[in-house]
């Protein structure tokens, strides 16, 4: 089927996005300020809709809109229910799991998290984002990482932006994460690799690139969740995996811009465990 979304702006200017056979997809449309807009759609369902950008976004946060009416949603009423966690962070709606990239950068604590914006179950993974000045009051930010584009229309495979960490270096935040692609049931066709991305303004992520694409000899297809730490002037990374059938934390060190495998840092010999 041919579903579409059309944004009509000042002067009747239109932006159209055709969805075709895409199953789930995050669509971004540019809105110049100080205009009136109308959104039309057919053959698709809008699950979440928000406004982002503009000045002071770190303080204001994004503005969630009702997909049917276009009205701004009042978060106080949305969160003030007996089934909502009131102390710890939770997203606006739908699935959340692993927290990632926890760091302090340019005056804010940053929390990234694995998310499925489209439903209340695990699916292809996005990275959501929130910021805080005190670790109690959180401001919602735009999603920063999406699944690989081919997964939008592929029901036979799963993947996306899996867990990772952050390292702040001066005016840049470096995000390290695992990209996953494989069949619905994990196995030897499953592929996981590590990437690095840069964030300069605390909002937008750019220049994501692979940094470790091949597993060391003997490592299983479970090869994920990079944690990067600097010690004595050198950058180290640990990854969860299994080495020759033994659950292992793999140690890497950065040398000359490349990550080199040094061996297992810790192993678990208790039977019945698949991976760290």
Where are these regions (language model features)?
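Beta-rich carbohydrate-recognition and catalytic domains
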Residues: 1-225, 229-276
């Amino acid at each position: 089927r041919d579903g579409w979304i059309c944004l009509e702006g000042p002067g009747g200017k239109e932006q159209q996005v055709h969805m075709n056979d895409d199953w789930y997809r995050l669509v971004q449309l540019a809105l110049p300020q100080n205009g009136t807009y109308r959104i039309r759609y057919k053959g698709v369902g809008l699950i979440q809709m928000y406004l982002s950008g503009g000045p002071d976004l770190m303080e204001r946060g994004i503005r969630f809109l009702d997909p049917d009416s276009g009205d701004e949603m009042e978060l106080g009423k949305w969160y003030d229910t007996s089934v909502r966690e009131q102390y710890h962070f939770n997203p606006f709606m739908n699935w959340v799991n692993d927290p990632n990239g926890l760091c302090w950068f340019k005056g804010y604590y940053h929390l990234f998290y694995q998310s499925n914006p489209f439903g209340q179950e695990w699916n292809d993974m996005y990275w959501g984002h929130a910021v805080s000045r005190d670790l109690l009051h959180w401001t919602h930010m735009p999603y920063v990482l999406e699944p690989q584009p081919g997964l939008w229309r592929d029901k036979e495979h799963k993947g996306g932006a899996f867990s990772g960490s952050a390292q702040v270096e001066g005016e840049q935040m470096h995000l390290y994460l695992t990209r996953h692609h494989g069949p619905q049931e994990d196995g030897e066709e499953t592929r996981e690799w590590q990437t690095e991305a840069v964030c300069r303004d605390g909002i937008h992520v750019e220049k994501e690139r692979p940094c470790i694409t091949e597993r060391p000899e003997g490592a299983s297809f479970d090869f994920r969740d990079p944690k990067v730490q600097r010690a004595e002037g050198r950058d180290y990374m640990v990854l969860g995996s299994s080495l020759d059938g033994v659950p292992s934390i793999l140690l890497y060190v950065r040398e000359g811009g490349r990550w080199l495998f040094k061996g297992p840092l810790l192993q678990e010999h208790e039977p019945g465990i698949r991976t760290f």
